[in-house]
Design a protein with these regions (language model features):
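Helix-to-loop junction immediately C-terminal to a conserved catalytic motif
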Residues: 55
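Conserved ABC transporter NBD signature motif
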Residues: 63-71, 83
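Conserved ABC ATPase "signature" region
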Residues: 71, 116, 122-140
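Conserved ABC ATPase signature
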Residues: 145-149, 153
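A short, proline-enriched helix->beta-strand linker immediately N-terminal to the Walker B motif
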Residues: 164-168
Length: 232
């Protein structure tokens, strides 16, 4: 298997009134295509920040990021737009990560519109229905709004939105921590099925050891911004 993501000496520091906060401090790792790297640690250890820096949702202080062998450490705007097609994120809170003014179909269809993937409204509608079916959302919900659905279905919307552009790589930031235990297993199994079907590569961020054991091929432990252990 080929290496899809390589991170070298990545740092992310924040200025605070007490000096520099080393949220991510000299972290290095690589992920092979089709595998899941579980990143586990207590709250505040820097694991979510790491995922956001890898996706350029936050700028790195220092370090190198390679995606499919290409250095993407400081991408220009056009390159970053291109990277968004292949690098996506599923957020922790399905309650706040979705636009409350958009319907399910509009949320999932928005990336397709931004990237001009579909040539007609009919093609767009068909693609949205296909994605909804893939993530286990019945067609009857396409005109529903996020507040009308439970947490599990909201997270399925977030997963569908992330899948819309057929990415290669997804950062999953505590995607089941806000859900009931009974729903957590359903979402985890869905994500594993999607990974097998589409050969997706995940960084799976969590504080729950049982979750990371269930879904991960490799596990990285973080503490105070530092990688303290990595196992396969």
């Amino acid at each position: 298997m080929s290496t899809i993501l390589e991170v070298r000496n990545l740092k992310k520091y924040f200025n605070t009134k007490n000096g520099l906060l080393h949220a991510v401090d000299n972290v290095s790792f690589s992920i092979e295509e089709g595998r899941t790297l579980g990143v586990v640690g207590e709250s505040g250890c820097g694991k979510s920040t790491l995922g956001r820096v890898v996706l350029h949702l936050l700028p790195a202080t220092e370090g190198q990021i390679l995606f499919c062998g290409e250095d993407i450490s400081n991408p220009k705007k056009a390159k970053l737009h291109e990277l968004r097609r292949n690098m996506q994120m599923v957020f922790q809170d399905p309650y706040s990560s979705l636009n409350p003014r958009q319907s399910v179909a509009e949320i999932i269809g928005e990336p397709l519109k931004v990237y001009h993937v579909c040539r007609s409204k009919q093609e767009l509608d068909e693609r949205v229905r296909e994605i909804m079916d893939t993530v286990g959302l019945p067609e009857r919900y396409q005109h529903s709004y996020p507040h009308e659905l439970d947490g599990g279905r909201r997270q399925r919307i977030g997963i569908g939105r992330a899948l819309a552009l057929n990415p290669k790589f997804i950062v999953c930031d505590e995607p089941v921590s806000a859900l009931d235990v009974s729903i957590q297993a359903q979402i985890l199994n869905l994500m594993m099925d999607l990974q097998e079907k589409y050969r997706l590569t995940y960084i799976f961020v969590t504080h729950d050891l049982s979750v990371v054991k269930h879904i991960s091929d490799d596990i990285m432990v973080m503490y105070l911004g530092v990688m303290v252990e990595k196992t396969s």
